Amino acid sequence: MNLRAAIATLVALALAACQEAPPPSDEGVARPILYEVADGTGNVQAWLFGTIHALPDGTKWRSEKLNQSIDRAGMLMVEIAALENEPRTRAVFARLATTPGQPDVGLKVNASDRPRLFEMIRKTGLSPRELSATETWAVALLLAQLGGTGDAENGADRAIVRAFLGREIIEFEGVEMQLGIFDQLPEREQRDLLSAVIDEYEEVRKDPSKLRRAWLEGDESTLLQAMNTGILSDPELREALLVGRNQAWLQQLEPRIETGDRPFVAVGTAHLLGDDGLIQMLRDRGYKVSRLQ
């Protein structure tokens, strides 16, 4: 079970208005979204990098500007640091996701969505009976893996963590807290999440590599368009999965900036963009946040 890929499909490329165009770049050169944070005098204090959780073998995405920023940083802040500890991730998922006596999974969606739901379940290699004790949010995460491209072993998040080995690495959440956010969603919102995953699967099948290309190109407008019609367009899900988390992360990040730790922040691209993103939140706090690539 590739849980990080599931989570990535749900929350990594979120969406709200961000109109800043990427700097000029030679065609074909990867330029994932990278910003620097400076004080009022222009002194660079931090960096913000939008990650993706799975990539095909051989994908080139490490630019000179990115490598220079990593070298200048003093420490790393990420959603989850222990990405390689998959046994623990599976154990936490199984514990939080399992509650006996769940309603039949087909009753958790509208009748019109049931054929697509059962088709997706079949493609996971599971059966509806095997999901009889699985909570709705967990079914959504399992199904969200379908249609994705790439391998989590090649994910930008893992590569960034490896680049900071030997320096301080701080988790904003960790796996238990992150999955706990899904687990604590009201059942109504969990069902909205499941329905949204079913709808998004249809879009992903039309062009499975669309969001990956947008990430590589730093194409914020495409990422915005994708998510403005996706899971995070639901106000309650957006608040729980994006806005509230960003606010909590800002409370951890700002002291690190102010004490001169030079943090490099590497989180799902969703958490950077838009009025509710970390970029705008830092600007609202008086920092100068500028795009490097």
Protein language model features and the residues they cover:
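C-terminal motif of bacterial Sec signal peptides marking the signal peptidase cleavage site
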Residues: 14-17
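Structured, acidic catalytic/metal-binding patches in enzyme active sites
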Residues: 21-26, 33-241
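Amphipathic coiled-coil/heptad-repeat helices and related helical stalk/stem segments
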Residues: 30, 62, 156-157, 246-249, ...
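A cross-kingdom marker for long, charged
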Residues: 236-293
